[in-house]
């Protein structure tokens, strides 16, 4: 039912960004259920996806459940789910190259912001793909912006070459991408 609903939503609202969050390793999660979730992630191709490993809390109902998943298994499943989403995010980023986006300029990028753009992001906790040409920022001044579907401190950023008016929406053209961020130029 949910796959059909998502397909109808996407058909009815072109360009919509669908986001969700999953907990990996909840007590009783079997390998088969996890594989079903992975298939759902791969088939649905969410625009934004968060994954968290279940953390046992003493005194909670779930904390007392049988079938607690070993940390190593949760970590492996987390990594596998995020790898699947990273592949989806890269494909979605690549598909946006050459397209125009309306972005909200947040601030001028500092050297520290730019260093983090092609190496590591605390937002995602994942190493960026720095081997691709599109994953690197060329020297120069950048504005950090957000797309219309991007939540601050959670989603990727749009690094726009040059200066945009901070606090305003501006149109940009996507010219590259990292795993989760876009690189753009003003239109």
Region roles according to the model:
Residues 64-187:
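Terminal RNA-binding accessory module
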